[in-house]
């Protein structure tokens, strides 16, 4: 941050010297009083809520949306926040303040016949959960939302309009927030957004109007206010700011960036996350000294409409959000508010008419000049506001207002077409019992039956006149839980223990098995699924996304066929179908235990990370845990029905080291497990962290290799694995790549030819559970396409390539699946990939492991070299370590190069020596895999060289452990 500040300061000085002077002559930063404030520690009871009870309540509330199956969705959610913020600065301010807040959001959405999306929302905010409305009240509100959104769906679309309007308290609150509140934010008045800067002391609103921002208000009009705080994010005490008094502009919202005439902060410097504070709104309150009844304001509107020759005026009842441009950076000084419910109020007294598709637009001064009157009762709009300093909680409070002239535009037309099929109803029972008698539990059954029944309906009925029907469908769903823990120097940085969630993917193909609509392999549509929603929720999720996927694939199929008609494939490629047919299969694998003890993992991470306190040269040190358990389900239209549980838990250790030459090096290692139960003890993990730290620190004063070296090099441990995995386990190598063109770079072209040293065999084990006492994470019994693979798949024999691995997607060099489709480990991207299970590099004609170094030295002597080199990498390490070995004495010492280049595949055709010892490694990247490989190999004619390292200036302030 100091370096960044210096850079910005230099840029500011240059800007002052090279650009026209700014009209505002105020300083860049203002003084502020020293504050001392300490909120009492948060009682433990606030950190825990009865999740089961709240889930029951939310289910009861959201069930009200089931009254109308055609709604796209209906949700009730609770966000509960407990935070404790610490603010200190060099001036002596020390502020500690708490925020405990609960917010329930109700949301539903319909789609009109023309594709227009029609969302409707309602929220409740309270600083005490017991103060939230009763469930009965929220159910009533949800039912009312259903009626309103259905009415909105059938409402006519409004055309662009100018004329009089009324804005409800909620709508006018958002209106004032967007067009006025943002233009009161002081930092915007420095340059660009200066709409009201020179209007201080002038009438900007009717003289009856008062506008102020007051972050000290916790309640207003019987409602808790979201913009409440005691101190802002610069440690300045919050205070009320009277922006408009009797219609006259008096003041702006100030952070510690001053303006001419406003030299100090008034407690509105706000931010979120790691962004710099700027002046932001808090609780914006609009009041009037001369309130009118709604009937009086309606009469005003009708009279004004007649005066302007308009048939009607508008009443804006609810809005969802808005945005504004304040003129900064050359932007247009304008605003756009997005109403949800808008009514025409007819001048002749006819009943109001609901319309949709209205956007309220304009420029602030013009709009303000037409504000005429305000009502009696205030409404509260709760929200969060996004700007350059992040998202901050805000509130806008206003009565209904009457405006003599507004402007609207017609909302941009959506390309979305309503679903072809009607939504599946609620409360139906599965139409089949195919999963009875399997290992499926009740949760499995609700998911699988939901997927299967909706797929049958879609396959039977999904069609658009004149377009091809789907010939193939595949649904993926994963039910998962995750854990993420990080600790630094013995302190917990974060712990995210996320409960069960769900996500899916939908594939709907048109065309045929010979030529389908995929433009790329795995053309799925990510599918949001309500966690815990059961059979009905599963069906509705796949109904929505099947329709989207079908329409997308109709377009991609037309695009693909047009391209192929214009550019016919070569005969050898044309005969290859896009897909392989699958035989029906049902395999439901039982779930297994994955017990997350977040406290235990947090304690373990803290203990292990504390080890770094003994290594003052290492910075940015951390120990973290990352894991997920997933039950992944797949159902296809070929009657492939699968459930596969899979999981991982990864320990990551990382650190930075500033080397003697000024360059900064990052390093780390990881350990991979299937479940938390396999994690080693604190003592073992601490020992591994210490070993890593000692090896890393030893690099600090190691010089860079000055001369280019070309000769024999021994690759040891993981460094002996990388030449094989990096050269072979990628698409177009041992993994077949789908491409609708001749593929000259495909490794498959070399089937039957030499690619490795004749002493090397490579076998892919699929179901092998362990090897010489080590558990293999790569073991699997059936692949993600439902194919049972061979237990051993020979890939290379005596250096000759025998075959490559593939899924159910024929390619030029792999026409059939080898059972190598795997579900990926990322629960946020449910997909399939091609992968090995256990990759075994076997060798004959090996050398005893303890003689490998002698072989290396012998080769060096033969070449009359003074030194030879060894590259090693401990299990899971991120970087490689280089050792220089004296040919005469055998002495080893650390060396360093700036770029480590692994051997190419062609260099592996002749390996000088291969260790008889084998190492076993478990890896967890896209999928869980295992590797069995010789512990070392020696290759000749390897080139090692270095570039000049990039030196970085040391921090101006020493790392705390180095002081």
Model-derived features: where do they sit?
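Active-site bordering "gate/hinge" segments
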Residues: 1-231, 236, 240, 245-248, ...
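Short, small/polar residue-rich loop motifs at catalytic or cofactor-binding pockets
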Residues: 235-238, 337-340, 787-790, 877-879
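Long hydrophobic segments that form regular secondary structure
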Residues: 236, 307, 787-788, 798, ...
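C-terminal, non-catalytic macromolecule-binding modules
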Residues: 248-303, 800-857
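Short linear motifs in exposed loops
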Residues: 98, 253, 354-356, 645, ...
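Glycine-rich phosphate/pyrophosphate-binding beta-alpha loops
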Residues: 182-186, 255-270, 340, 358-364, ...
